[in-house]
Amino acid sequence: MVQKKIEANLAMVEAHFGSEADGRVDEAVGLYTDDIIWEAPSRNIVLHGKQEVADNYREMFSGFKDVEFRTLDRFATEDRVVDDSVISLEITKNGFMPFPVGTKVEMRLTHIFEIRDGKISKEIGIEGPPKAC
């Protein structure tokens, strides 16, 4: 039973990143509890609820293209998933990162997901400094 929960949690996080990378915001947000808490501590952002997160994702991902996640490490328990990845993308609009449009960027991104009743109830994304590549 415990192993099945862990496997389900890992699969959910994989689906979450896949939907983000492909710009399928509604699918990504569908994996959250209604009372999701989403944090980006390095940007001093804390969002509450699916709508706030969806609005943020639409704004954020509208400034990127060719988004890819490269997992360095990922592990889970019955109620947590930790993922350490490198995200690569191309900037398509000004304002989110300190690079001009057209810049290809990589950034280390570590996530801690809390899982409740088969959905993500809290997501903390710890961003390393982005660098042009």
Locations of the language-model features?
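Internal, well-ordered alpha-helical scaffold/interface segments
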Residues: E14, G30, Q51-R58
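Short, low-complexity N-terminal intrinsically disordered segments enriched in polar/charged residues
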Residues: M1-D34
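Short beta-edge strand/loop motif at the mouth of beta-sheet-based domains
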Residues: D35, I45-D55
